């Protein structure tokens, strides 16, 4: 799916798929494509969004995450198709805190609750992980 971005899997290595100076989305799995689509949509509003794809949580590419998240002035958003508990968002937050890097930080993830059943597009919209909802959340956080 990420072939058009020149992506090649390397164990434990995160990869910048898109550079951006206003926002950095750190994402994994399905949400990486959504992040790229949201970045493209936000560009129409002159919001420059970078996307860092994290292919593995263990080992986690801490050096790349800390370096990219530490760039001054950017909102850092972790987007994952996982619960807010025990996933990429918590791992990134812990590593940034441990490194003394404190960007504006938000998470896009599934709530820590029993979730409804249904068609995936409907659920993704309901729980805020559709492309449109990701873009809308980021616009709201930048206000």
Positions of the model-derived regions?
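Thiamine diphosphate
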Residues: 1-143
């Amino acid at each position: 799916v990420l072939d058009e971005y020149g992506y090649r899997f390397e164990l434990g290595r995160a990869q910048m798929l898109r550079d951006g100076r206003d926002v950095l989305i750190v994402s994994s799995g399905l949400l990486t494509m959504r992040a790229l689509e949201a970045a493209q949509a936000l560009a129409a509003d002159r919001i420059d969004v970078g996307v860092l794809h994290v292919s593995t949580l263990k080992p986690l590419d801490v050096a790349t995450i800390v370096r990219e998240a530490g760039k001054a002035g950017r909102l850092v958003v972790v987007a994952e198709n996982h619960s807010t508990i025990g996933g990429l968002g918590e791992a990134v937050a812990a590593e940034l805190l441990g490194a003394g890097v404190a960007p504006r930080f938000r998470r896009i993830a599934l709530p820590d609750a029993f979730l409804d059943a249904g068609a995936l597009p409907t659920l993704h919209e309901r729980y805020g992980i559709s492309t449109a909802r990701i873009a809308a959340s980021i616009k709201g956080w930048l206000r």
